[in-house]
Amino acid sequence: MTTPLTWHDVIGAEKEKPYFQQILSQVAQQRQAGKIIYPPQEDVFNAFRFTPFENVNVVILGQDPYHGPNQAHGLSFSVRPGVPAPPSLVNMYKELEQEYPDFKRPNHGYLESWAQQGVLLLNTVLTVEKGQAHSHANYGWEVFTDAVIEQINQRREGVIFLLWGAHAQKKGRFIDTNKHFILKAPHPSPLSAHRGFLGCGHFKQTNNLLAQQGRTPINWQLDPIE
């Protein structure tokens, strides 16, 4: 019986590289200078904490973290409990309602239960300055998250990648479609959701692909938070 691979096994060496250390020091300097950086330091790598490498069956790629107060906590599209679901996530709920008539839109936007079921909720850039979208886009995070995608591609099989919008779809070049599945649609943002995200059927298609492989489908329903 082989020991399951951990994130440390597959990306530990990547995190030792000079460019990665440079990202961490750059972000730390920004925080020390009094800038507000999201998510908080302890949450930056939550996507990896909540979804162990051996559990990754689905990847939903985001771009960079939400840049409003108390929103970002290290999972793409997700917000902390008590914070209203942002517009992109509301559109994801609308799509779930279309695909699953029994889906009840939750009173929150906290997606931890998806992550714990094997949905890696990965942003391609892992930090952002308050109120400034894409402010850390050139820090080098994408070198790291590209390496993450490459490792999933190499060492896992049958993973379903949900690539919404042009930014996420660029990452498709790392994915071998002979061993994995890619589902593409426009981004769920209000700017583009009506161009084909709404009606894409991706949540149900994901579960059909999991079931075909004998894997447990995702329960997309989120329990209410009191």
Curated annotation (Swiss-Prot):
It is found in: Cytoplasm. It is an enzyme of class 3 (hydrolase). It holds the Pfam family UDG. Gene3D superfamilies: Uracil-DNA glycosylase-like domain. GO terms for cellular component: cytoplasm. The keyword Transmembrane helix does not apply. This is Uracil-DNA glycosylase. It comes from Proteus mirabilis (strain HI4320). The active site is at D64 (proton acceptor). SMART domains: UDG, UreE_C. Excises uracil residues from the DNA which can arise as a result of misincorporation of dUMP residues by DNA polymerase or due to deamination of cytosine. It catalyses: Hydrolyzes single-stranded DNA or mismatched double-stranded DNA and polynucleotides, releasing free uracil. One of its GO terms (biological process) is base-excision repair, AP site formation via deaminated base removal. Its EC number is 3.2.2.27. Keywords: Cytoplasm, DNA damage, DNA repair, Hydrolase. The keyword ATP-binding does not apply. NCBIfam families: PRK05254.1-1, PRK05254.1-2, PRK05254.1-4, PRK05254.1-5, ung. It comes from the Bacteria. Belongs to the uracil-DNA glycosylase (UDG) superfamily. UNG family. GO terms for molecular function: uracil DNA N-glycosylase activity.
